[in-house]
């Protein structure tokens, strides 16, 4: 099974578990770091994410993973909040954080810059508009390597 298929399969099964515990499944990733594999589950809620919440979701997901055994190699399960400087992966994430400050990292420079920071004004399937100082800058989505919420306390 490809990594993409694995993630999609896990998403279908983990999403109802997270929702049943009053959390939103924010993102799933399966990564190799050094010699170790990690299945990372990011959860969120309107009221934030507590350590106890992560533990509760982790136990429930762990039971599911033991039952369905979707990953043949050994791995560590990590459940956490996406954090204050969270990556915005989906249109749903972008919609939620319209009018917030974001950081766009680019694959290659546009106007000699590989990083843009500003207020998320709008987006569509092809581009993202951000307000940088008093100007609206339109960045093609294909040029964006990562979109991150600019955490401000």
Swiss-Prot record:
Compartments (UniProt record): Cytoplasm
Record key words, sorted: Cytoplasm, Ribosome biogenesis
Segments traversing the membrane: none
Domain of life: Bacteria
An annotated GO BP: translation
Entry-linked NCBIfam families: PRK00092.3-1
Function description: Required for maturation of 30S ribosomal subunits.
Family as reported in the entry's similarity comment: Belongs to the RimP family.
Name of the molecule in the record: Ribosome maturation factor RimP
Gene name of the record: rimP
């Amino acid at each position: 099974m490809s990594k993409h298929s694995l993630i999609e399969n896990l998403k279908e099964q983990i999403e109802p578990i997270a929702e049943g515990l009053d959390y939103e499944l924010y993102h799933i990733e399966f990564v190799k770091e050094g010699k170790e594999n990690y299945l990372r589950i990011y959860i969120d809620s309107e009221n934030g994410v507590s350590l106890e919440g992560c533990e509760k979701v982790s136990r429930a997901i762990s039971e599911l993973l033991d039952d369905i055994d979707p990953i043949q190699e050994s791995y560590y399960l990590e459940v956490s909040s996406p954090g204050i400087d969270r990556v915005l992966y989906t249109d749903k994430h972008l919609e939620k954080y319209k009018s917030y400050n974001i950081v766009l990292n680019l694959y290659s420079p546009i106007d000699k810059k590989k990083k843009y920071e500003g207020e998320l004004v709008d987006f569509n399937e092809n581009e993202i508009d951000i307000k940088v100082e008093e100007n609206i800058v339109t960045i093609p989505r294909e040029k964006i390597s990562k979109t991150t919420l600019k955490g401000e306390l």
